[in-house]
Amino acid sequence: SLSYLLQHNKEIETIFHLTCRDRNIIGLQSELLGAAALGVHSILTLTGDKPDNGDHPFAQSVFEVDCMGLLNIAKTLNAGKDLAGNDLDAPTNFYIGATGNPGAPDLEIERQKLAAKIQNGAHFVQTQPIYDLEQAKRYIDKMSEFDVPIMLGLIPLKSFKMATYLHEKVPGINLTQEILDRMEKGGKEAGTEIAIETLEQIKKI
C-alpha cells in the first residue's frame, strides 16, 4: 500500500520489497496479486531476516519458502497461473528483482546464487547497502557475465548507533573502520556526507 501511495500521490517510482518471513505461500501470492491490482509492478524478492535482532524478537517466523520460492511464485503469476495451476484473468507484469551481497565471504558462491536467481525469474539485482567501494567493484566484476541490471544499494547513516548495528547485526553489510570513526565523531551530518561521497563514487563504477 505504501508503494501504491508513493506512486499514485507523489509520482515516485517504487520497488515493493516482499520477504518470506511473515507469510505462507498463499499470503505471499495474495500480496503479489494485490500489488498487481494497484499497479505496483516492480518487486524485490527477499528471504528476510529472523526477528531475533529486531524490536519484536518474540515474533514467530514463517519461511515456508525462501527467496527462490518467492521468485517462482512471481514468475508463475507472470505466466498467468496461480500456485494451484488455475488461470488468472490476466497475467501479472512484474519486473522481478533479487538481492545481491557484495559483502559475501565467497563471491563465487554468490555468483552461483545469482545465476540460480536469474534462472528462477529475476530481471534485476539490488544489492545490500554499499559502504566499501572496493568491495562493490569486486562484486560488479564477478557478476559481469550476467545480462541484468545491478543496482548498488545505499542507505544514509543517521547515527553511530545505526552504523554499528548494521555492521555487527545485519548479514552482508560491512562498514569500513574509517566510516565507523567518522560516524562516531560526526553523527548524522557525517552520514549525509558519506552517502553523497559514496553516491558520487558509485557513479564511476
Give each language-model segment a name.
Residues S1-E13, F94, E184-K188:
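Flavin-dependent oxidoreductase catalytic cores
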Residues S1-L5, N24-S30, K50-D87, D106-I109, ...:
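Active-site-adjacent beta->alpha loops and helix N-cap segments on the catalytic face
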Residues K10-T14, G39-H41, A90-I96, A122-H123, ...:
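Short, well-ordered coil/turn segments that N-cap beta-strands
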Residues T14-L18, I43-T45, I96-G100, I118, ...:
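Hydrophobic faces of well-ordered beta-strands that scaffold small-molecule active sites
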Residues F16-P51:
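A generic, well-ordered mixed alpha/beta core segment in the N-terminal half of proteins
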Residues N24-A36, E108-A115, K137-D141, F160-M162, ...:
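Catalytic cores of alpha/beta
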Residues G48, S61-D89, T99-A104, E145-E197:
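Active-site pocket-lining/capping segments in soluble small-molecule metabolic enzymes
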Residues D87-Y131:
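Internal active-site segments that recognize and position negatively charged phosphoryl groups
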